Amino acid sequence: AERLGVALEPLTPEQARALNPGVDIQCAGGVLFPLDCFLSPPRLLAALRAAILRGGGEIRNGVEVTGWDAPGDDVRAAKTSAGDVSGAQYVLAAGSWSPRTSAGLRVRLPMQAGKGYSITLEQPPAQLSVCAILTEARVAVTPMGETLRFGGTMEVTGLDESVSARRVAGIIKSIPRYFPQY
């Protein structure tokens, strides 16, 4: 990180614990990246939804895009399971399904679907004030408002929605080694 110019501060175990009062942290030390940040996906999506609606946009839930009326480079309408939707602009926000959803348009979306695994504690006994990476366990820990998310492992699997119990168990097993109170 230092070679790349990323700001960092090595921490003793005591300094790591001092960043998160009330949390029992078992560590040999840490590294603080003061410019790191994190967000709560539900809060972000709620804010984006509100901004779209304030700006006069329209959001349609439970509607599938089935094709496009798009002669040449002009998009006249999105064909959906609820009928055609015409507009001056469109936002395609289908995540991993965006390449499939955009079929028929003259766009190339170089995306690869993948899935990560996470466990969210709804009411942790104590809350972290900064995010953490449990390097040896390969688990990221992110405070999200009143919840705490432990996430690890990323699989590049295409649109396979199956869940590996082994990967989930690996995350669960790692938590008490670093945070005994969880």
Which residues does each PLM region occupy?
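Conserved beta-strand segments of alpha/beta enzyme cores
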Residues: 7-9, 58, 77, 108
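Helical element adjacent to the flavin cofactor pocket in flavoenzyme catalytic cores
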Residues: 23-89
